[in-house]
Curated annotation (Swiss-Prot):
Belongs to the complex I subunit 5 family. The keyword Lipoprotein does not apply. One of its GO terms (cellular component) is mitochondrial inner membrane. It catalyses: a ubiquinone + NADH + 5 H(+)(in) = a ubiquinol + NAD(+) + 4 H(+)(out). InterPro entries: NADH_DH_su5_C, NADHpl_OxRdtase_5_subgr, ND/Mrp_TM, NU5C-like, Proton_antipo_N. This is NADH-ubiquinone oxidoreductase chain 5. GO terms for biological process: ATP synthesis coupled electron transport; electron transport coupled proton transport.
Length: 612
């Protein structure tokens, strides 16, 4: 075996061993020590992160991609399923990022969840999720990818409903699993199509044998799968609802890792899509619609976690736009940079929520810059990185995406929506900074504001460093596969920056407008549209069940009771009997001449018929 291949495969084996060891220790009959989460889980993930740097450095030095097939799961005359791992640009970069972010979040969770009696089980769930995510990222066949896909889905369900004593948490968990199940149907049907028509689930073989085939049908299934998992328009309501889970869950699953699985699926299978204009156009338009709609919803939300959740959905829409542009590597770059600052935004939110006695309404915060300077500074850095401030992590990916959009020959509709959404991103990010950090405190003086704990500050600082330098590090070391347009007019080059600055100016104007009321009864149509999430939950979650109930009631009362038991049954029998009675009673009226005439005619007719 080639030394590079040996290093890559043994590193992955070492990572899995380190992550699975704490899970094995839980199988013993004796209960775990109360510090098990810190001594076993956090240490294992820290060590796994350090091990994952080895294949990264080898890849940077050698630039070789490797596929390792270890074991045959199923071997028939026509179909093979192997246990195979793919070490390429995507899996080698994403694995250390996932481990680094998880390490920071778990350290934060040790403080956030310290009073929870089942904290060890919580950490075990997070560890299981991480293993499923790494299986998904490194899989080289669809079956293995599907195992990771379902693994992250079920862990999401368990972690959203962690506080299952609350009805909202149970509802949100059920909602997440149902929406994801719709997406899973698309993935399962696509896999069935690939197995039937391409006779393989190995990704390399699928690429080779799909040349010349019309792949529109399976690609639509894959896009449906990505729509469900990555909260694209139509299947997006589960992501803001998922904020019912603990903040570390939101930071890990619903910002940086699990929600990008749908986008990652499309990136991994992008060679199937690159020549299919239907699939690319669907991705482009769906992503543009998602990024604008969810950014619009974020503008007027008051729950700090909901704002960050909608911003996640908006950034996922931007990644989908990039896939529609035929630029999967840019989408992956945005996944990597987005993971750092979005996880950090959630951790800062969690720290502030905990400090204010579980208060999540930004209108009841304020003045946090003086009370929690480190957390507020990191919140500001994260928000600025999200808006695409030059030289922070988000700038390197967002700017490249908008430049690619500007210089492409695709429809201007998607470009306009994306630029609007980028402007809105600046508005809601500055709104969070304005309400949370600036001004005077708007909460009770008894709030236990305290950030002087290494378990709070260290993870946020680590992610802050990632939010500052990750974009530069990744773009410096990995050359793009598609050469971008190197020369363009100044106004195109500055487009992303200009819409961001205009967004910041609009945000300042809106902030001043919120303190004034020009009319006694102001018209709030646009505000209500944004605040009520475009009336989407009201229509889908209320109107659809109401229509079904009305239909059921109509069938039960109108069709069965009214029609069958009343009209067809008793009344119809009565009408039929009446007709027969009326007919026979009309004959018996004592008209002798008529009877004799009829008798004579009928007799004559009978005789004539007999003679002839």
């Amino acid at each position: 075996m080639h030394p590079t291949t040996l290093i890559l495969s043994s590193s992955l084996l070492m990572i899995f061993t380190l992550l699975i060891y704490p899970l094995i220790t839980t199988l013993t009959p004796t209960p775990q020590h109360k510090n098990w989460a810190l001594t076993h889980v956090k240490t294992a993930i820290k060590m796994a992160f350090l091990v994952s740097l080895l294949p990264l450095f080898v890849f940077l030095d050698q630039g070789t991609e490797t596929i390792v097939t270890n074991w045959q799961w199923m071997n028939t005359t026509t179909f093979d399923i192997n246990l195979s791992f793919k070490f390429d640009h995507y899996s080698i970069i994403f694995t250390p990022i996932a481990l680094y972010v998880t390490w920071s979040i778990l350290e934060f969770a040790s403080w956030y969840m310290h009073a929870d009696p089942n904290m060890n089980r919580f950490f075990k769930y997070l560890l299981l999720f991480l293993i499923a995510m790494i299986i998904l990222v490194t899989a080289n066949n669809m079956f293995q990818l599907f195992i990771g896909w379902e693994g992250v889905g079920i862990m999401s369900f368990l972690l959203i409903g962690w506080w299952h004593g609350r009805a909202d948490a149970n509802t949100a968990a059920m909602q997440a699993v149902i929406y994801n199940r719709v997406g899973d149907i698309g993935l399962i049907l696509s896999m069935a199509w690939f197995a039937t028509n391409l006779n393989s689930w190995e990704i390399q073989q699928m690429f080779a044998s799909s040349k010349g085939l019309d792949l529109t049908l399976p690609l639509m299934g894959l896009i449906l799968a990505a729509t469900g998992k990555s909260a694209q328009f139509g299947l997006h309501p589960w992501l803001p609802s998922a904020m019912e889970g603990p903040t570390p869950v939101s930071a890990l699953l619903h910002s940086s890792t699990m929600v990008v699985a749908g986008i990652f699926l499309l990136i991994r299978l992008h060679p199937l899509m690159e020549d299919n204009q239907t699939a690319l156009t669907v991705c482009l338009c769906l992503g543009a619609l998602t990024t604008l709609f969810t950014a619009t919803c974020a503008l007027t939300q008051n729950d700090i976690k909901k704002i960050v959740a909608f911003s996640t959905s908006s950034q996922l829409g931007l990644m989908m736009v990039t896939i529609g542009l035929n630029q999967p590597q840019l989408a992956f770059l945005h996944i990597c940079t987005h993971a750092f600052f979005k996880a950090m935004l959630f951790l800062c939110s969690g720290s502030i929520i905990h400090s204010l006695n579980d208060e999540q309404d930004i209108r009841k915060m304020g003045g946090m810059h003086n009370l929690t300077p480190s957390t507020s500074s990191c919140l500001t850095i994260g928000s600025l990185a999200l808006t695409g401030t030059p030289f922070l992590a988000g700038f390197f990916s967002k700017d490249a995406i908008i430049e690619a959009l500007n210089t492409s020959h695709l429809n201007a509709w998607a470009l306009t929506l994306t630029l609007l959404a980028t402007s809105f991103t600046a508005i809601y990010s500055l709104r969070v900074i304005f309400f949370v950090s600036m001004g005077h405190p708007r909460f009770t003086a008894t709030a236990p504001v305290n950030e002087n704990n290494p378990s709070v500050i260290n993870p946020i600082k680590r992610l802050a460093w990632g939010s500052i330098i990750a974009g530069l590090l990744i773009t410096s070391n990995f050359l793009p596969t598609n050469t971008p347009v190197m020369t363009m007019p100044t106004h195109l080059k500055l487009a992303a920056l200009l819409v961001t600055i205009s967004g910041l100016l609009i945000a300042l104007e809106l902030a001043s407008l919120t303190n004034k009321q020009f009319k006694l009864h102001p018209t709030l149509t646009l505000h209500n549209f944004s605040n009520m999430l475009g009336f989407f939950p009201a229509i889908i979650h209320r109107l659809t069940p109401k229509l079904n109930l009305t239909l059921g009631q109509t069938i039960a009362s109108q069709m069965v009771d009214h029609t069958w038991f009343e009209k067809v049954g008793p009344k119809e029998l009565f009408q039929l009997t009446c007709l027969m009675v009326t007919t026979t009673s009309n004959i018996q009226q004592g008209m002798i001449k008529t009877y004799l005439t009829l008798f004579f005619l009928s007799t004559t007719l009978a005789v004539l018929l007999t003679l002839t």
